[in-house]
Amino acid sequence: MKYREIADGIFVDRPNRFIAHVEMNGAVETVHVKNTGRCKELLLPGTAVRLEVSDNPKRKTKYDLVAVHKQGLGWVNMDSQAPNKVVGEWLAKQGYDYIKPEFTYGKSRIDFYMEKGEQKYLMEVKGCTLEVDGIGYFPDAPTERGVKHLHELAQAQRTGYQCAVAFVIQMEGITEVRPNVSTQPEFGTALAEAKAAGVRVLFLLCRVGRDSLEIVEQREG
């Protein structure tokens, strides 16, 4: 996936989940943050950030904060909408006969439903931006929705679907994602139960470009 236009800035602070102050060309701009997660380990004062320039002249903010430079690691795409977009592009190249985003299963909306011949597939997508000592972790904050999705995938797997949870690693140099049990042990339990039911765990490694994010490799978890 590609962004329309990218500008550079320096992170100043984040008054709330939705906006941040960024220094650009000597002035401080209020920008929209495309990730409502905490991201405290990423958004440090003085850190270089990348922003997508909005093409909507009626918007209150001209920019969306989409990437941040992490010392010792490199650029991290922190756009929470990017994982589903890149997976959608990637799935289109995987030989499926039919792909439907936002598929209702049980009491959840699963990110992707696919068909190949007679086989039906479900895939839930999770974006990973948290890195500790060269390992990716998910979630960076408790997510009851994420736990619920894993239970739904395990149930679907038992009824004949081929199911997978795909972790999109939104940074380079990281090849695996582990459940962040220190933040939410329930997610780790649900992931283990899903794997035991036959749900595949995929790590999707990405190339983080200045104005792009692209899946370059798939690994099994």
Language model feature labels by segment:
Residues 134-144, 154-183, 205:
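Nucleic-acid nuclease catalytic cores
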Residues 40, 71-101:
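Acidic-basic catalytic patches of nuclease active cores, encompassing PD-(D/E)XK
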Residues 44-56, 205-206:
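Flexible glycine-rich surface loops and low-complexity tracts that mediate binding to linear polymers
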Residues 9, 110-140, 153:
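Conserved catalytic cores of phosphodiester-cleaving nucleases, focusing on short active-site segments
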Residues 37-50, 154:
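Short nucleic-acid-contacting surface segments enriched for D/E, G, S/T with interspersed K/R
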Residues 170-221:
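Domain-level recognition of nuclease-like catalytic cores that cleave nucleotide substrates
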Residues 16-21:
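Short aromatic-glycine-enriched beta-strand elements
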Residues 27-41:
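Beta-strand/loop nucleic-acid-binding surfaces
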